[in-house]
């Protein structure tokens, strides 16, 4: 947020790429800072957020205290599968199939994958949400899809501080 404010540019879109609360709880704060910005996600991510938001807020609020969302935002469903930032195309991929609720963004001009929860950087992978063999196979297939892009930069959905993103 500080980089956007310092740039003097107008933030138009806040994209939520996953239905886990660590991906959307902060949207409330960003929306307060950038009230003109639209908070968007895919249909599958919104469906998961909508189904679980009340329970996630009830569980996490006591643990987060003053940092818990007061009015969590349910993102709007984006139209299409692309966004633009400063004229650069950003593709939202992985929006169909078993992992439609775990999309990723691909920036073709710089060959970058950004923010996919399937990718962990220097952390043990979280497997509690993929316990069935079919879910693990879908995860492996998505990783194969990501690898086939031959990205020059990969920003994991979760990473330890200092993780190299190249």
Locate each region found by the language model.
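Metallo-beta-lactamase
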Residues: 47-101, 109, 147-150
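Acidic/histidine-rich helix-loop elements
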Residues: 57, 122-133
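Active-site metal-binding loops of divalent metal-dependent hydrolases
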Residues: 1, 18-19, 44, 117-118, ...
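Active-site metal-binding motif and surrounding structural segment of the metallo-beta-lactamase
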Residues: 1-39
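Conserved beta-strand hairpin/beta-sheet module of binuclear metal-dependent hydrolase folds
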Residues: 1-6, 104-107, 111-117
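Structural recognition of the beta-strand scaffold that forms the well-ordered cores
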Residues: 12-16, 38-42, 91, 104, ...
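Divalent-metal (often Zn2+) His-rich catalytic cores of metallo-beta-lactamase-fold enzymes
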Residues: 106, 112, 137-166
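Extracytoplasmic/secreted cell-surface and envelope-processing proteins
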Residues: 22-25, 48-50, 123-124, 163-166
